[in-house]
Amino acid sequence: GSDGCGSGCEGGYYRVTPFAENSISLEAPETDEDFYECAVAFGTFISDLADYPAETLHETIPNFHNTADRYRIFHETLERAKADPQLAPRVDEAADMIAFALEREAEAGRLQAMRDSGELPTRVTHNDTKLNNVLLDADTRKLMYVIDLDTVMPGLSLYDYGDCVRFGASTAAEDEKDLSKVGLDLHLFEVFTKGFAKGCRDLTPKEAEMLPLGVKTITLEL
């Protein structure tokens, strides 16, 4: 229209980006090289934005990876469920899983504590590091773009790393109901770690040391 807005605008704002010709995205890695390239992509994303003031970014989802706060909510919900006659039996049924989560509470809050103390740097992070958020060249299978930027917020590099390993190196689909099929492919774990370290060139020694805890923490959050 004359106001520069198309007929379907409805008064909102739209972000327009160039169409990535000859690009593909993957729901799961088809080769080790695919997973490696995605790791390089997300590591490079963090590294390239290392000098951007992360604190100026709007938090689309406040406390998104504040694991200690998630445990606080978990405790409150658990107490309410125990006091509810209809929900209390379900608490008993899930006793083993509840115990599993509670036994790991101290470790799960460690990264947030290290961030709060400044031991781990707050960075610009993607916060949705699934493989399908990387566009690869269909012919060369090399990185073209990192997409889906609506959750870019201040965070820890370890969360981006951990979320993609959790998703991409799993031995089962995200919605698999048979938990006996769910595990971590250590070979893909190694492939991704090498690619991420190559892309995120300025990881601090402490960040590198804590990478495995990033995977455990994100898995517990979910």
Mark where each language-model region is.
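Catalytic activation segment of kinase domains across protein kinase-like and atypical kinase folds
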Residues: 132-173
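Short beta-strand micro-motifs within the conserved protein kinase catalytic domain, predominantly
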Residues: 1-10
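Active-site activation/catalytic loop segments of kinase-like enzymes and analogous catalytic loops
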Residues: 158-201, 217-222
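Conserved short submotifs of the Hanks-type protein kinase catalytic core
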Residues: 10-23
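Protein kinase-like catalytic domain
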Residues: 46-53, 197
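Short amphipathic C-terminal alpha-helix that caps PH/PH-like domains
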Residues: 38-45
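All-alpha amphipathic helical-bundle segments outside canonical DNA-binding/catalytic cores
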Residues: 203-215
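ATP-dependent phospho-/nucleotidyl transfer catalytic cores
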Residues: 5, 20-38, 51-126, 131, ...
